[in-house]
Amino acid sequence: MTTNNPFDKVKDVLKSQDQTYNFYNLSKLQDPRIEKLPYSIRILLESAVRNCDNFEVHEKDVENILNWENTANKVEIPFKPARVLLQDFTGVPAVVDLAAMRDAMKRLGGDPAKINPLVPVDLVIDHSVQVDVSRTVDALEQNQKIEFHRNHERFSFLKWGAQAFDGLFIAPPGSGIVHQVNLEYIAREVMNGTGNLLYPDSVVGTDSHTTMINGLGVCGWGVGGIEAEAVMLGQPMSMVLPEVVGYKFVGKLPDIATATDLVLTVTNELRKKGVVGKFVEFYGEGVSTLSVQDRATISNMAPEYGATMGFFPADENTIDYLASTGRSNTKIEYIKNYLSSQGLMCNYKSQSHPIFTTTMELDLSTVVPSLSGPKRPHDRISLNSMKQDFNSCLSSPVGFKGFGLTADQIQKKATFTFKDKQYTIGHGAVTIAAITSCTNTSNPSVMLGAGLLAKNAVEHGLEVAPYIKTSLSPGSGVVTEYFSHSGLQEPLNKLGFDLTGYGCMTCIGNSGELAEPLAEAITKEDLVVAGVLSGNRNFEGRIHPLLRANYLASPPLVVAYALAGTVDIDFETTPLGVSKKTGQPVFLRDIWPSKDLIQQTIKSSVLPDMYERVYSNVNDGNKSWNELKVPTGLLYPWDEKSTYIHNPPFFKTMELTVSKRPAITNAYCLLNLGDSITTDHISPAGNINRKSSAARYLESKGVKPEDFNTYGSRRGNDEIMVRGTFANTRIVNKLAPAVGPQTTYVPTGELMFISDAAEKYQSEGHQLIVLAGSDYGSGSSRDWAAKGPYLQGIKCVIAISFERIHRSNLVGMGIIPLQFQPGQNASTLGLTGKEQFNIELPTDKSLIKTGQTVKVTTNCGKSFETILRFDTPIEVEYWANNGILSYVLRKLLH
């Protein structure tokens, strides 16, 4: 049931290039509070006004947003994003769920065709390609062949989805990285809907770095796959109206600093500030000196600094970027006219600015060349402190900034033979150097900077050691076009940075294997070797299992460290080598390109027709994609033999009516965890360990170890993913004596794989909980980090704090998030994890309130109070329905 929109009275007409458009004109509300609102909140306001029907979106919601100054962080609002963005690791399980929902819809007597996206959905296949082959001119071709061999089942399923679901566009493998493709091609900036109705573009994506689009002035952030599926099916998102931190930029970046240095600085500062669950909106004259690509780099890492968004309102630079990337003049004109008419066009040089919850300031001129690491993206180190910091980490106690080595261990070296030559390496040896990730490959200034540095190095005859795994994996074919046009691909190739693929690759751990002699040497001497990458995450175990120190850096610094061969170097005092041209030592400063030269190269080599040429072919696919044979029809014909695509159990026993959720009594603790447990720890994306439960399952199905592929590629199969839950080899569980995916089966004291213990608990009818520290679930927006625990029988997670997306995912799967009271944790309460737990939460949903106190008791006589992290009333409904998808399915059936 819907009613007429009470705000139709503010509908207005906009003329642009002889075309007439309609829009909901916020100025016609004649409310002085609008001008004070942050730009990001104005976009939420427009959505509420346009979608108001007093059923899903109410007039009270509009008033709450107008009154943001007094209601921020106090009220819940509905939000209807304009579109949904997927990548294949999270997109495959989303489409699997939609296919399973169609089956359930038919079983329960409904129309399966009702399960169809109601908003545009774009899926870019970018997570499957790996750096199997590198340092050769045909690496791209070889890696793509291997990718199709490994993933033909998944790709076939996605191709079926493209024809089965209306409004689902799929960019085939090799198109680029989802967020760069979104920035350069997919993003509309302003949507043109039915009846020429204009409204702001907005997006939610099943990848936490969806925020990259904030650099273009588009509202967008990462959500769990299950929440995205609900949005696809027309369900408004329920969210707490966020506080907005205003971050003022003054001055401009010094010549030697890059956008990467800036984002690592911003990430460090905002993590210290604490912005989880908040919007960050950038303002001040300094912003006007940054290109859209610079801004997108900063927005990309919003998950790393903890914010829901890192938002840059649109300005003239935004309009120029749209033109430079080949958007049509007609679109650009109505975009500019609409944003100006709607009060969404920003003048960063203006002295006036919106009211913010709180403000911060950064003088851009103070930014210096930087890296972050060795284990977290917000642990920034200035380049001139890098050598000292790394050596300090070697001897410091094991932790985020320590490896706990003794003085004797620090002296260890390893000698090995590679391609008939002997090499000796020590701690800090660079073994992976990757120009990777949409964070940086979308930005011509740092990419061409790397190319120019490579050119200068080659002119001096400098080389990169052949055992170092170097790779170049840009986020779109546009990079290849401008590298080719500028002549800079050739020097990069000479240093080993041949094109390896268009996808996430090393940034998400798809780094492939190291050379065998090198890997054996590292393992034998237990060396702390390093990776240097232009990515956005460096959590332990993510980039490669053998690399314990990983540093985020700009593309030019990636090339520099590859040349150096070690992170244990002071570039100011130690040369990269001796010039074959002059016979003199060559320092980094001698080959670092000037900002003027970089800008000249951008002007001459990055051309609008490159974007048009690359993206005009995106719908055509490639030969391998086009030759894929796929089934047709509304319902997917599940193949029980498939180890990639499997009909999940989420809806198989679901009934039309809702049953009361059972009480949690005498539950055992499956894991007792510490701080900063990431979604990589909970549901790894990388290679499947040959000794794991998932490996045993695959072998039982006749899959050879060389064909195991990665956990990320297997997310369409629940049987593998439940066995891969908590299977990270670096997970630290206090119920196990050593690091790794084991736990104690409490009833007998037996040590076993976590997944085996979960299966044993379930077979004996025991409920499960997890104890955890702060920032539980940080990292990627990985729905299997909630689906896996759900299938393992985990009913509740008790933590000091939760990362935003993961908390939402837990609720979306019907798992209860409980938060310890301030100052308390498992240790202070004397909990070992060997107790049995009773969670005193009412089973009647009408008795449950958001944020209420929930008492937990144990069989040892201990009791403590926790905070229920159902943050909005609708989340109580999701839990009562055993998850958001069951809730939506029942809604569609009724």
Swiss-Prot record:
One of its GO terms (molecular function) is aconitate hydratase activity. Substrate binds at Q87, D207, S208, H209, R537, R542, S781, R782. InterPro entries: AcnA_IRP_Swivel (IPR044137), Acnase/IPM_dHydase_lsu_aba_1/3 (IPR015931), Acoase/IPM_deHydtase_lsu_aba (IPR001030), Aconitase/3IPM_dehydase_swvl (IPR015928), Aconitase/IRP2 (IPR006249), Aconitase_4Fe-4S_BS (IPR018136), Aconitase_4Fe-4S_dom (IPR036008), AconitaseA/IPMdHydase_ssu_swvl (IPR000573). Belongs to the aconitase/IPM isomerase family. [4Fe-4S] cluster binds at C438, C504, C507. It comes from Dictyostelium discoideum. Transmembrane segments: none annotated. GO terms for cellular component: cytosol. Binds 1 [4Fe-4S] cluster per subunit. Its EC number is 4.2.1.3. Keywords: 4Fe-4S, Cytoplasm, Iron, Iron-sulfur, Lyase, Metal-binding, Tricarboxylic acid cycle. Catalyzes the isomerization of citrate to isocitrate via cis-aconitate. GO terms for biological process: intracellular iron ion homeostasis; tricarboxylic acid cycle. It comes from the Eukaryota. Its main location: cytoplasm. Its cofactor is [4Fe-4S] cluster. This is Probable cytoplasmic aconitate hydratase.
